[in-house]
Amino acid sequence: MDDNKAKALAAALSQIEKQFGKGSIMRMGDGTIERDIQTVSTGSLGLDIALGLGGLPRGRVVEIYGPESSGKTTLTLQVIAEMQKLGGTAAFIDAEHALDVGYAEKLGVNIQDLLISQPDTGEQALEIADMLVRSGGVEIVVIDSVAALTPKAEIEGEMGDQLPGLQARLMSQALRKLTANIKRTNTLVIFINQIRMKIGVMFGSPETTTGGNALKFYASVRLDIRRTGAIKKGDEVVGSETRCKVVKNKVAPPFKEAHFDILYGEGISREGEIIDLGVQHKIVDKSGAWYAYKGEKIGQGKDNSREFLRANPALAREIENKVRAQVGLNAMAVEAAPAGVAPVEP
């Protein structure tokens, strides 16, 4: 660059910093821009791997959507629990007025420190979210759900009034305001969303999410979560087999999938995932119904093997660390495994 251009650029940069503040424009090579994206675990090892970075990115917008009873709120509560373990403050904006506090506590959420709001209108919910983000005092804000963010005009109107595009405009305006503050304060904002059917679609999927297209554009990560089957103990259904697909990912390669079990009253079965991923990466051996690690039997059947790992958390961490090492994620702290524990049999 010649001297005249360099002087003109330096003057422009100086004027920008004077008008908009220091740091409003930076040179990438100066090292002032953070390259490494901070993440928080989802509570599911398989999903952390599928996301590519080991969890959901902080300072970004995330959308989690799926059919009813697919595990959307369960997944977000697990993320809140993981953030609280790191010492972060979490806020839950319950627009559906349906949060089960007892269930959240079972999933490991510290209810005493959880900030909760049950707003009357969509505008109120999004304004509260914006104020929390701008404060810089919270690490994660969850909005449950976009479909329940009812505009004030709709609440004050009559029961059959046609108000097309009102919610979409509300979401578009809110996200325009939120995104810069989310990045500046490094806050993770999760929107839970529901699925609707488009009428008259002949080709392609008729499914769509509520709240217009703005969230699809602003979200750095979009997760599609589905229930694929039931987990039974005898005739009793004790959980759901779940598939979670990374539909959009701006921070790592997208379109990866994770399969995990959600046990009722417990949440995502981490031990079940460790067994499945251990077998997949040839760390755990499977012979018939038996599972073995380093030649030692863990248990017969997945349920018994899961119970064995639950009783031996240090061994579970050791297997998890080997899986993490193979996929390039950071290891967990390993403790010495207790000796002389027999494998679990039926």
UniProtKB/Swiss-Prot annotation:
GO molecular function, one term: ATP binding
Binding residues annotated for ATP, in chain numbering: 66-73
Pfam families: RecA (PF00154), RecA_C (PF21096)
GO CC terms of this entry: cytosol
Coiled-coil parts of chain: none
Keywords: ATP-binding, Cytoplasm, DNA damage, DNA recombination, DNA repair, DNA-binding, Nucleotide-binding, SOS response
Signal peptide per UniProt: none
Main location: cytoplasm
Protein's cellular compartments: Cytoplasm
Keyword flag Signal: no
GO biological process, one term: SOS response
PROSITE patterns: RECA_1 (PS00321), RECA_2 (PS50162), RECA_3 (PS50163)
Domain of life: Bacteria
Function according to Swiss-Prot or TrEMBL: Can catalyze the hydrolysis of ATP in the presence of single-stranded DNA, the ATP-dependent uptake of single-stranded DNA by duplex DNA, and the ATP-dependent hybridization of homologous single-stranded DNAs. It interacts with LexA causing its activation and leading to its autocatalytic cleavage.
Recorded family membership: Belongs to the RecA family.
Name listed for the protein in its UniProt record: Protein RecA
Species, as recorded: Aromatoleum aromaticum (strain DSM 19018 / LMG 30748 / EbN1) (Azoarcus sp. (strain EbN1))
Taxonomy of the source species: Bacteria, Pseudomonadati, Pseudomonadota, Betaproteobacteria, Rhodocyclales
